[in-house]
């Protein structure tokens, strides 16, 4: 097998006949500016070919389920192993999928509880045991040899027989004596009396003395087995002469309850055996939503925290509750979020002093909604019920998804539900300290190894704040990718090609080092790891770097530099530089060698106005007060899970939007919002969602440049002659578009059992328009030619012919580093980072926009150092127009350029949720708490 993956003549997208040799079993970073061709090389060439060859090696039966994969456009690729792509996308939309099921940790937990879990009675708390013949023998051995005892079996009449009839059958089977009414009696003597047999009757199966010889043990075991059979699973030992008895049962029962023997399906919420019967394993049902009943937990019961108890008439419920609550010392003036679980239970389910004979004393939230249900024949009560209904935790399983029997099974005092609700960092500590009995430890050894390894992998990629019951569809793209990475590590595949797309997204600098170790582990077990990445730490930790460029689009697609990382410092003079190329062409090497850098601002912008959030309590936020300065760039930092998104996306954005009268989802829990809110007239969350709901949406239509282009073509002489208006040059309206493909340029053929086929339209050949429309030209270019231009090409073309209005609308796209994308490129093909920057370009192009707060969530996703510089210039342009920028970010190049930093932490999950430091980068870097300061100091000084 070759030591290299050899690519010859790669021509996918903008790649320019690339020849490349990539070392196998190494950690390789592919880098370059946005649009340079990195993804074309990594995913559209390497992954596509590796996956295609693997699929072709399968049987024809297996291939029919996987669909046909096209061969990437290149001369040949040699030495490529089976490829696995781990991309930035949410891996599952299945509402049943969790972090535990995705990483397979939950499967091991199920097996662990099925094998070594011990069942405890919910009534007495005693362990429930199912006895065997061996248990009986072991107990007998505790007595000294020669001790006399009797093995008894309870008389269990067969259905339809009386006790007397059953005794006759026992007599026929060879049994002679019974234990009845406190004495041993012969069966025939009891039957001769003719009296009705009542009370407990035990058949004497055998009379023995403790004998530990082989024959003695064999006889004891045979007799015990017979007793279990005759007694329908029950057996009693009676020792002489004390008459002390001990009961044994092969039935799994205690306290009058028959329990289910633990098995792995019992702990599966995807199996009808283990799933809660009420919610079918989803954990949620449609019911009374606590967040709607108590929308503001900062209020007390007295102040009206229970929304349905407000108003002139319904307010009587609050008054009655407050009056009766005094008996139980319920704190009616305490904010709801400070109430103990016990006090919350009283409010919802009833006071402990409630008297069923006094209806007023039973007032509580449950009673209120019971009253509403009884009056639903009235429209106002039906409306009220609808107002407070929503998805809420299942009342039967309390959101655990499992039936109650699963929680009776415990290991070291914990049920499986307890474990999946722990943050992974806490769960890892619990497993590290677990003490099991010797027998259980031997059975669980392999399972514990797998669980501990997978938990450690999750910690290594910086996701220790997650819980195993966290839904997969609530994870960010970066979190999903890293969860997928840990799954790959846990599977221990070797000889594969792993291709990752920016695994450092959403990762604080503190966690990058641990991520690097994970990537190296993947390499060390015998895999080739290729990472498309811009993070400097990961680049320097790689074995080999491939720099694609030098620029984007048609100015990219070449290998500017490749070589071992150790050659980087002297790259300018290295013989490994590609001929006819130089260090000056590689933006990556310029930054890595210090020749170029993102400069620090000469000064930090001062501010005197702010928006202030008080008492933020959403998720893990600890009731914090935070001020966001206006007309400056504020960066919210902190490790993953520290509360950044909860503060900014969960509270600031919706609260501010509602305050200025715009429709928005309900914000998370907080006390109040104040400050200079009137200075903000609009708030915009610039996310990474597609710029349009339709695949027809493209950058030119989004920034309104296409309207001007259509007007230009409608003004051409041939258009005037033919009567073509601007509408004829739209692919969204009838007239000039190709009606065969409806202006899409492609036709989608739905396949019944395979992936849909997307074929070029045979009528317009992908041009989107009718032939007579394509005859209209502006300086030699028809409308289809213009849509195929990149932003850079279009600006150059329209500038040459003085179409300044079009240039003005396209210029912001170039300013934010998107000069390489095509005007007509479908929004569905843009990455999240590209979508975000198209939106940013739109706002930059708006001249008369009112004072706005722009909120960005990791805008540097997918950006090279060179592109970040352009992005910061765009931010400065918005601020200079009187706008405010708030950014959630981990990238130190952006953080060091902030005017104001809000550092959250100090850690993730329960250990986060506080404000660690605020102020300028210089002020924050001097803080000794949290993790941001340490890394920021290295960038500032």
Name each model feature, range by range.
Residues 1-941:
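Conserved phosphate-binding elements of NTP-dependent enzyme cores
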């Amino acid at each position: 097998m070759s030591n290299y993956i050899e690519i010859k003549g790669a021509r996918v997208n903008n790649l320019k006949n690339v020849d490349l040799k990539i070392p196998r079993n190494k950690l390789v970073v592919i880098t370059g500016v946005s649009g340079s061709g990195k993804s074309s090389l990594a995913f559209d060439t390497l992954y596509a070919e590796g996956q295609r060859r693997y699929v072709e090696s399968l049987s024809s039966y297996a291939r029919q389920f996987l669909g046909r994969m096209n061969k990437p456009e290149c001369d040949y690729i040699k030495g490529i192993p089976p490829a696995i792509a781990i991309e930035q996308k949410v891996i599952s939309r299945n509402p049943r999928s969790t972090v535990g099921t995705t990483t397979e940790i939950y499967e091991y937990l199920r097996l662990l509880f099925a094998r070594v879990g011990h069942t405890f009675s919910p009534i007495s708390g005693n362990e429930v045991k199912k006895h065997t013949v061996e248990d009986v023998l072991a107990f007998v051995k505790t007595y000294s040899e020669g001790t006399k005892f009797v093995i008894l079996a309870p008389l269990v009449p067969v259905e339809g027989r009386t006790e007397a009839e059953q005794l006759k059958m026992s007599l026929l089977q060879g049994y002679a004596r019974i234990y009845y009414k406190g004495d041993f009696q012969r069966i025939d003597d009891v039957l001769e009396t003719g009296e009705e047999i009542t009370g407990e009757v035990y058949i004497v199966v055998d009379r023995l003395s403790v004998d530990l010889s082989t024959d003695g043990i064999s006889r004891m075991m045979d007799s015990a087995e017979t007793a279990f059979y005759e007694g329908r699973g029950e057996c009693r030992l009676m020792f002489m002469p004390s008459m002390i008895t001990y009961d044994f049962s092969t039935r799994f029962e205690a306290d009058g309850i028959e329990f289910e023997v633990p098995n792995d399906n019992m702990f599966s919420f995807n199996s009808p055996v283990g799933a809660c019967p009420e919610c079918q394993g989803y954990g949620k049902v449609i019911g009374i939503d606590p967040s709607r009943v108590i929308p503001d937990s900062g209020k007390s019961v007295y102040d009206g925290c229970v929304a349905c108890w407000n108003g002139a008439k319904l307010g009587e419920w609050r008054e009655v509750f407050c009056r009766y609550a005094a008996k139980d010392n319920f704190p009616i003036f305490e904010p709801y979020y400070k109430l103990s679980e016990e006090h919350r239970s009283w409010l919802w389910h009833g006071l402990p002093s409630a008297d069923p004979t006094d209806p007023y004393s039973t007032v509580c939230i449950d009673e209120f909604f019971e009253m509403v249900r009884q009056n639903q024949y009235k429209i106002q009560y039906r409306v009220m019920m609808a107002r407070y209904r929503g998805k809420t935790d299942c009342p039967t399983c309390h959101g655990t998804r499992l039936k109650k029997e699963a929680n009776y099974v415990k290991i070291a005092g914990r049920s499986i539900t307890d474990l999946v609700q722990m943050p992974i960092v806490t769960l890892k500590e619990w497993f590290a300290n677990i003490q099991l009995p010797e027998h259980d430890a031997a059975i669980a050894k392999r399972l514990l190894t797998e669980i501990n390894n997978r938990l450690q992998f999750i910690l290594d990629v910086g996701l220790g704040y997650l819980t195993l019951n966290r839904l997969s569809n609530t994870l960010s793209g970066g979190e999903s990718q890293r969860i997928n990475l840990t799954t790959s590590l846990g599977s221990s595949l070797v000889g594969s090609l792993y291709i990752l797309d920016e695994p450092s997204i959403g990762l604080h600098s503190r966690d990058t080092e641990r991520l690097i170790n994970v990537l190296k582990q993947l390499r060390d077990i015998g895999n080739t790891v290729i990472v498309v990445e811009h993070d400097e730490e990961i680049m320097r930790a790689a074995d080999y770097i491939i720099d694609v460029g030098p620029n984007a689009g048609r100015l990219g697609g070449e290998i500017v530099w490749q070589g071992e990382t150790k050659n980087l410092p002297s790259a300018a003079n290295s013989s490994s530089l590609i001929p006819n190329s130089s260090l000056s062409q590689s933006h990556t090497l310029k930054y890595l060698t210090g020749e170029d850098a993102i400069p620090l601002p000469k000064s930090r912008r001062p501010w005197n106005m702010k928006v202030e959030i008080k008492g933020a309590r959403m998720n893990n936020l600890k009731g914090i007060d935070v001020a966001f300065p206006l007309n400056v760039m504020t960066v919210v930092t902190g490790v993953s899970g520290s509360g950044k998104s909860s503060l900014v996306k969960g509270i600031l954005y919706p609260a501010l939007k509602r305050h200025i009268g715009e429709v928005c989802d309900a914000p998370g829990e907080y006390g109040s919002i104040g400050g200079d809110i009137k200075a903000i007239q609009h708030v915009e969350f610039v996310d990474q969602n597609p710029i349009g709901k339709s695949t027809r949406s493209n950058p030119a239509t989004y920034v309104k440049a296409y309207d001007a282009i259509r007007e230009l073509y409608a003004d051409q002489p041939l258009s005037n002659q033919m009567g073509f208006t601007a509408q004829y040059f739209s692919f969204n309206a009838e007239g000039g578009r190709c009606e065969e493909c409806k202006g899409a340029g492609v036709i989608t053929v739905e396949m019944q059992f395979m992936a849909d086929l997307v074929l070029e339209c045979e009528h317009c050949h992908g041009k989107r328009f009718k032939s007579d429309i394509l005859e209209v030209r502006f300086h030699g270019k028809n409308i289809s030619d213009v849509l195929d231009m990149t932003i850079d090409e279009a600006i150059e073309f329209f500038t040459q012919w003085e179409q300044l209005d079009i240039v003005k609308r396209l210029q912001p796209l170039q300013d934010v580093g998107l000069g390489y994308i095509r005007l007509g490129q479908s929004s569905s093909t843009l990455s999240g980072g590209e979508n975000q920057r198209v939106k940013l370009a739109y706002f930059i192009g708006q001249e008369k926009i009112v004072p706005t707060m722009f909120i960005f969530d990791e805008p540097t996703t997918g950006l090279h150092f060179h592109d970040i510089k352009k992005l910061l210039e765009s931010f400065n342009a918005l601020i200079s127009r009187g706008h405010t920028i708030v950014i959630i970010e981990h990238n130190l190049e952006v953080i060091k350029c902030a005017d104001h930093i809000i550092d959250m932490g100090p850690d993730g999950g329960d250990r986060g949720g506080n404000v660690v430091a605020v102020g300028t980068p210089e002020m924050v870097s001097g803080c000794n708490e949290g993790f941001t300061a340490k890394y920021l100091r290295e960038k500032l000084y």
